[in-house]
Amino acid sequence: MNRIARRFLGSTLGLILLAGPAMAQPKADPDWPCVQRKVATLSPGQFWTGPDIAAAGDWGSDNDAAVLAQKIASRRTDLSQVGPLLDDFSSKFGSDKDAKDKALTRVYAGVFEVINGERDKVVGGIARYSQGQRRMAERIRDEADKISQTKDAPSATDATELPKDQSELETKFAWDRRIFQERSQSLTYVCEVPQLLEQRLGEIARMIQAKL
């Protein structure tokens, strides 16, 4: 076997390990590659101890609440801006505490729906990403097997140059391996996103409840 092939094949075990915990260890969901525990979706009550959400009315029917909810739910809005935005919104109700509390509850309902919807999409995307990585890992293993088979080929011992088809296979193997590793590194960050969104939702819920 030539030196290039040996080097690549010697790193195959490391490649498999890079596939992520879900590919190396049994999981409840084989398509979940993250070390973080999978929570498929969230519920409003996880973060809210304020007034009844249903009794406050449909947040989408309250234009002011909907605009604010979408603004503060967006990750483009820094959390340091949320408090002042809530203060401005609350000031519109003067001394009418009941109206203010219901409006703020609608704001929370909107924030929850926006962030949870974004989070659901991320979780679904991670599953599809994991499936793609698994398929690529299988393809790379197949390529490695084909390269290793040349070791026993009749012409392998005396050959001074790689046959064209073998050279192309090793080039493809190296390229696929590089792509796989880069995607594995990206997955580490992507896996953090659902938890970051949960944290943002929890912090905004706390800020809203502090204004009640």
Task: Name each model-derived stretch.
Residues 1-11:
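Bacterial N-terminal signal peptides that target proteins for export
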Residues 24-101:
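N-terminal Sec/ER secretory leader and immediately downstream segment
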Residues 79, 126-129, 133-143, 147, ...:
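Long amphipathic alpha-helices with heptad-repeat character
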